[in-house]
């Protein structure tokens, strides 16, 4: 008989995945662990029927949680022993003593673990006395053997970055043969979480897992709103953001407003920072202030679609940067043309602008140096920098409606302004002094 032992604890708040605190709350840590347990259960379902499964668990918590996930086919037993090494040895020794010919034991925090990995451990055991499957951080996630060897587990510092090498050295010292399996990454730290975000962009199979779904839904979003003389729009925007406060960080960064903007921001509900004027300065300050995975830069005169956070998370499942499409609260045919050009430009020219609501990974934003120190064109240059780095842009499903306050007047005036904006960007690309371009732009606020 072949036996597969799953080593886990019952998901209990503030007991499981505690190394992820405070990046995740205790409740989120339980959610992540539970997602990984469901993935493990699906892996077990795919195993050859000749492999018997045992769930060895720490006794804290309600066992029915595990039984609801793994079902009645598995056999459930409490872990015994003082150290982690003792617990693993006792479990393997017990199962071997009951007639198993070979045993593999794995933890549950390996999102990439597949039935192929488990079955390959038994194939390796047919040719070796022991097997180890290493983790990227220097540990191992699976150990297997045909006879119980206590000395293999008598090492200090489980959880350190030398566990795999120390264990291999003990196996060699005992004169046992060793098969080494596929290396995978486990989830213990914030850095591990970010590594699996990267995997989500490239691995469609991983995106289908319970773990990937949890990671996607629990990415932290920071909304940064630069303000300057926005007394006519800031109250309306706060009403839109009211129901989002519990699910993300929201920061207003004022650039020295001379009207009532600052006093109209409800600081009992929203964080307010003060910066020197300039959207680049304001947005950079806001970005640095939030503990977020995703940054969403939002202009104050925007009207959001119904479920903006869900749209952002859907977008950032596949892209590292992107935006919403733009629309205008105007019936002017020219504004419809402007809308089409702006949205098409994201895919055609790989350029997005601030009024579309720029969305970007915080790590990527910091890596490229944040918004450049420019009085104007900071969003344009950000897009050019991303384009140079080969970053693909995505677009959310629905549109942000934004004010057409810059496009006042009749069709001729609107056309002249659109042409002027095009020429200003051309001047910037040619290297015309940015102060000259800024003077031509004229802030309407």
Spell out what each predicted region is.
Residues 124-130, 307-333:
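Conserved donor NDP-sugar-binding/catalytic core segment of glycosyltransferases
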Residues 59-62, 254-262, 302:
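A conserved acidic beta->alpha catalytic loop
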Residues 85-91, 274-290:
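Glycine-rich, basic loop-to-helix element that forms the pyrophosphate-binding segment
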Residues 12-45, 229-243:
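Short, well-formed alpha-helical segments that are part of the catalytic scaffolds
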Residues 103, 295:
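Short aromatic/hydrophobic "clamp" motif used to bind/position activated sugar donors
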Residues 376-382:
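Acidic donor-binding loop at a coil-to-helix junction in glycosyltransferase catalytic cores
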